[in-house]
Amino acid sequence: MKKYVCIILLIAMGCKGVSQEKEAVTEKEEEQTEAFKVVKSEEEWRKELTELQFYVLRKAGTENPGSSEFLKNKMAGTYVCAGCGTPLFKSEYKFDSGTGWPSFDREIEGNVAFDVDYKIGYKRTEEHCAVCGGHLGHVFEDGPRETTGLRHCINGAALRFVPEEQ
């Protein structure tokens, strides 16, 4: 009987901790939203974005690997935020990481912001648009050694491509 009581207590304590964590994350998200230059309601974002773009940019979702139209794009130009049009990555920074997501070895400085993400149980560096706060992806330290050593693993749904003028 003591065993069952202990198990129930452990489960109850675990649920309480998760509930408090979610509240803290929500408060943090609200604070971050106030800091962005482009702020829109959820309804406004839904009207402007596709379902997948909304899921990735506004709900910090992840598109399926290999599904991005930009994965094999070799054209010269700039990748901009699909939410607000802020230039984020230049095509010259793009490389084939073999991960299934568009990858870049660096961002356009000042236009991408970083935060810590523990959503899957361990620490990762999340990237988001510095202007509208849209979730872009994550940055890892396993990129090309001959450049920055970084791999910005980006959801193609978070991007639009603007070809270089010829």
Where are these regions (language model features)?
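Bacterial Sec-dependent N-terminal signal peptides
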Residues: 1-25
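Alpha-helical interaction segments
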Residues: 4-6, 34-36, 44, 91-94
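Sec-dependent signal peptide cleavage junction
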Residues: 17-44
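A short Gly-Trp-Pro
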Residues: 46-80, 86-166
